[in-house]
Amino acid sequence: MARGGMEARAQTQVKTPVVGKHVYGELYGVDEKLLQDEGRLRQIVIEAAHIANMHLVEVNSWRFKGGDKEGVSVIALVLESHIAIHTWPTYKFATVDVYTCGEHSDPMSAFRYIVSQLSPKRFTVNYSDRSYK
């Protein structure tokens, strides 16, 4: 009898779908000093996470030196997935990646906020539905 009850419970469990929303893009013509400002970039990523209704776990950043390849990378781990900014100040260029899992978060609002703070002369934005179907 116990076994039958266990089977009944297993059959009534509803699987939660995997919702994946990925927004990413390239920013051109960004101020070089801003792209080198590790502290400000960290702050922008943290603010973007809150705006997008994400739950921040940890933020790490790195400064890379090496001529025309120098830059800053900021990566925020959020419960829902991640936000990343990678910069190339010499080229006035940055890439932004915002990926979330779940219905409640809005990666596009995080991307738009980052763009508003970096003020590129132009940018591209891409969206990919990475949900399990």
From Swiss-Prot:
Cofactor: pyruvate
Cofactor note (record): Binds 1 pyruvoyl group covalently per subunit.
Site residues by UniProt (Cleavage (non-hydrolytic)): 80-81
GO molecular function annotation: arginine decarboxylase activity
Pfam family, one: AdoMet_dc
Alphabetic keyword roster: Autocatalytic cleavage, Decarboxylase, Lyase, Polyamine biosynthesis, Pyruvate, Schiff base, Zymogen
Modified residues (Pyruvic acid (Ser)): 81
Pathway: Amine and polyamine biosynthesis; agmatine biosynthesis; agmatine from L-arginine: step 1/1
Disulfide bonds: none
EC numbers: 4.1.1.19
Active site, UniProt feature: 81 (schiff-base intermediate with substrate), 86 (proton acceptor), 101 (proton donor)
Post-translational events: Is synthesized initially as an inactive proenzyme. Formation of the active enzyme involves a self-maturation process in which the active site pyruvoyl group is generated from an internal serine residue via an autocatalytic post-translational modification. Two non-identical subunits are generated from the proenzyme in this reaction, and the pyruvate is formed at the N-terminus of the alpha chain, which is derived from the carboxyl end of the proenzyme.
Listed GO biological process terms: arginine catabolic process; polyamine biosynthetic process
Role: Specifically catalyzes the decarboxylation of L-arginine to agmatine. Has no S-adenosylmethionine decarboxylase (AdoMetDC) activity.
Family: Belongs to the prokaryotic AdoMetDC family. Type 1 subfamily.
NCBIfam families reported for this sequence: SAM_DCase_Bsu
Protein name: Arginine decarboxylase proenzyme
Species annotation: Pyrobaculum arsenaticum (strain DSM 13514 / JCM 11321 / PZ6)
